[in-house]
Regions:
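Conserved catalytic cores of very large enzyme subunits
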Residues: 1-190
Length: 190
């Protein structure tokens, strides 16, 4: 931003200045003093377990309150892009609230549509897996139906945990929507 560029808070040596001027080093047009962090990874589980006093959000009791609380909190995550980069392990966040699958599907579909229409940044990302959940299956069903660009979605695959049926559902969804991406969860947690 232009306002941040009026400040010269970084001690940049002459060699680095030349590289910046030659556009060999990219600042991503954030200015000299970005006033918001780039990557913030909120603990969304705390929101689900305790609510948020600051935003006057009670602990969610159903799928509608759970998706609504997440959508509200997403608008308050400080980020240089003005969007949250990470949306959480959305299947495990929503799984406790899947009581009626038809009702949950409607809520999850609207939740995903809202994300696609309002968090329009390619860095917006969510995870599902490695455990096969009803919420995860409903998320995949909605992603396949909506074919939304956002959020980017990754399935955390673990050959010892992830069911064959769930990973096949992920693969069939990816053939339609180019997501989820597949991550080796076991490698990530070791």
């Amino acid at each position: 931003g232009q306002a941040e560029s009026t400040l010269n808070v970084l001690n940049i040596d002459e060699e680095t200045k030349k590289l910046l001027d030659a556009e060999i080093i990219c600042t991503m047009f954030e200015g000299n003093a970005p006033y918001r962090p780039r990557y913030v990874i909120p603990n969304y589980e705390v929101l689900m377990e305790k609510g948020c006093k600051f935003l006057d959000l009670d602990v969610p009791t159903d799928i509608w309150e759970a998706t609504n609380n997440l959508l509200i909190l997403y608008k308050h995550v400080p980020s240089i892009t003005s969007y949250p980069v990470y949306l959480g392990n959305i299947d495990t966040l929503l799984e406790p609230f899947v009581k009626d699958e038809e009702e949950a599907y409607k809520a999850i579909k609207l939740y995903l549509k809202h994300i696609d229409r309002s968090l329009t940044d390619s860095f917006v990302h969510a995870n599902i897996g490695p455990v096969d959940t009803k919420a995860g299956r409903l998320i995949l069903k909605a992603m396949k139906e909506l074919e939304c660009a956002m959020p980017n979605l990754t399935v955390k695959y673990d050959k010892d945990i992830t069911s064959k049926e769930f990973i096949e559902l992920c693969a069939s969804t990816a053939l339609v929507t180019a997501k989820p991406s597949f991550a080796n969860h076991k490698m990530d947690v070791e």
